[in-house]
């Protein structure tokens, strides 16, 4: 990745694809996260199954143990990183891994999920082609310029207020600086709730557009960043639909990998996987991305 430039007050962020925090010193020296997966199983948009009491969760390993193993792997690769994890089986409602699930982290580009839901919702049952194209590009390529346009058009922080109320989010708060959508705060648990809303509650047209864009996430983002860290690299043999997030501030580095993961064609979005991280100042993008990939790799055997 080329040197990351400081953004203006409207767009001073440097993002990495998909859903932590610490100052980035000498950003120009940072590169994009290493990525090895070249493809993933693709499945068309579809509604995730509702949780049912009759379905048993085939996951004998402790929820905390898996999350702690993930944290250990991430911190071994990037010492000093704070991690929030929430992984849920949407078919049963069972938690697979959870750690610091109620701790707030910056969303970075993960907030584009809320921008997309609000934008499409404002247009009723069917969005116009131009808006649909913009939302798709904003999500699949994590396009910041389009996010800026839709954020302003939607009333900035009013977008967060509306979506918090619509989804019932409990710990997602709008940024203090209304121009900086990436500084929205959320928790791993709230991001899981956002994915649950997309798959079970959002109108069919909205759901299909968003899931299609996430499923077709480009390896190279609009800003030139390699988005295939965390979920895409670690779970390359499974189907996935992801929204990654990355952001460099003077005080922190945020790197998030979030999405829906499937293990069979009939359940392409069975697992909601959310890993948010705050990594130390000066952590390079290759190190930061590889750290999340190392952690998420440990989920491969648990997601059956």
What do these predicted regions represent?
Residues 121-137, 142, 156, 206:
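Short, well-structured active-site flanking segments
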Residues 93, 104-127, 138, 273:
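Active-site SXXK
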Residues 119, 148, 152:
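Glycine/small-residue-rich loop that forms an oxyanion/phosphate-binding "nest" at active or ligand-binding sites
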Residues 23-24, 28-31, 110-119, 271, ...:
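Hydrophobic alpha-helical membrane segments, chiefly transmembrane helices and signal peptide h-regions
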Residues 43-57, 94-99, 114-119, 140-144:
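Acidic/histidine-rich, surface-exposed loop or edge segments in extracytoplasmic proteins
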Residues 2, 12-15, 33-52, 58-83, ...:
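Penicillin-recognizing serine hydrolase domain
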Residues 80-83, 88-104:
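Short, conserved catalytic-motif segment at the N-terminal edge
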Residues 2-26, 131:
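N-terminal export and membrane-targeting signals
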